[in-house]
């Protein structure tokens, strides 16, 4: 495995935090090494080695005992997480959330005044709260292209003609997206 596994563990903790993704988490964190952290780093000696590496780079501070053979606590500022993400080549969870919000705002602008505007408003609300939106899949750009294309239809089209026009594949809409729209109908009525 490449990279610093302790750094990835710290990033993973931030990724699970709605407050971090919403941009409201600040201050310092000071976790005690537990089984989960030790296992994630590849064992206690590896955890200590990786912590030393991050400490020398100025990302964290550690509190050790037993002449450096054991670790009591790790201290790090929330502000260091974007730097750790950059170091490890991982998209910062907060930046990802902001990217999703911008993406949905652009999609909402394309369908302003339609029934989809409320659906997009709800997704934006959830993203601003720091929620991980899994449905719809935020990375599935084609799904959103289909939604907006439906709103902009001037006349009825056969499903395959629509699929070919929007997705360049006459069977893809039926195969991948026909059922996904069901959940959207319930959200749009909220």
Q: Can you say where each PLM-predicted feature lies in the sequence?
A:
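Nucleic-acid enzyme cleavage-core boundary/entry regions
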Residues: 1-190
């Amino acid at each position: 495995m490449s990279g610093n596994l302790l750094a990835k563990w710290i990033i993973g903790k931030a990724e699970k935090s709605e407050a971090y993704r919403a941009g409201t988490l600040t201050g310092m964190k000071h976790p005690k090494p537990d089984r989960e952290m030790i296992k994630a780093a590849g064992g206690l000696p590896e955890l200590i080695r990786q912590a030393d590496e991050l400490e020398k780079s100025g990302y964290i501070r550690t509190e050790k005992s037993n002449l450096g053979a054991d670790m009591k606590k790790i201290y790090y500022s929330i502000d260091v997480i974007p730097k750790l993400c950059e170091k490890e080549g991982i998209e910062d969870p907060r930046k990802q959330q902001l990217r999703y919000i911008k993406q949905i705002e652009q999609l909402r602008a394309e369908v302003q005044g339609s029934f989809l505007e409320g659906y997009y408003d709800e997704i934006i609300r959830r993203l601003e709260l720091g929620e991980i939106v899994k449905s719809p899949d935020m990375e599935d750009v084609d799904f959103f292209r289909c939604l907006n294309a439906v709103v902009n239809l001037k006349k009825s089209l056969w499903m395959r003609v629509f699929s070919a026009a929007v997705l360049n594949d006459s069977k893809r809409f039926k195969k991948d997206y026909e059922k996904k729209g069901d959940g959207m109908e319930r959200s749009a009525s909220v």
